[in-house]
Swiss-Prot record:
It comes from Polaromonas sp. (strain JS666 / ATCC BAA-500). Pfam families: Peptidase_A8. Its EC number is 3.4.23.36. The chain crosses the membrane at residues 15-35, 70-90, 95-115, 135-155. Belongs to the peptidase A8 family. It is found in: Cell inner membrane. This is Lipoprotein signal peptidase. The active site is at 125, 143. This protein specifically catalyzes the removal of signal peptides from prolipoproteins. The gene is lspA. HAMAP family: LspA. GO terms for molecular function: aspartic-type endopeptidase activity. It catalyses: Release of signal peptides from bacterial membrane prolipoproteins. Hydrolyzes -Xaa-Yaa-Zaa-|-(S,diacylglyceryl)Cys-, in which Xaa is hydrophobic (preferably Leu), and Yaa (Ala or Ser) and Zaa (Gly or Ala) have small, neutral side chains. It is a multi-pass membrane protein.
Amino acid sequence: MAKAFGKTSGSMLPWLGLALILLIADQFTKVLILGYYRLGDATYVTSFFNVVRVHNTGAAFSFLASASGWQRWFFTGLGIAAAVFIVWLLRSHAGQKLFSFALACILGGAVGNVIDRTLHGYVVDFLDFHYGNWHFPAFNIADSAITIGAIFLVLDELRRVRRS
């Protein structure tokens, strides 16, 4: 049985592999968007989904997007710090499957968005879900991976609390 803290059995390599797959999927889709779409271009796919090209200089939901530019480096540093911390956690808890899956998702997404901020100064978003005139803020594969990872972290904690 895995311990709540401390080393557990298992290799972190499969989790790093999952993070790498998510990172590659994220960057590949962003390369396609940057290559085929100009800023603001949109393809209407369904009555509720578009593919668009949006540049997000802020964080989730464009938080701090209108700041003077310092946020690029702040969020880049935060992403790097999160990635280092996640790798450290994976080394210690690789045998905890649900926890490690969640961390791998967050790691892949965080690194994907750090790459964008470093190369472009913004994160490339392109998935646009909407209903009528209401639009959910555009997002990308990295954002999806981070969200899925966060959901699984909560589920893992609920499972852990339920067992105790």
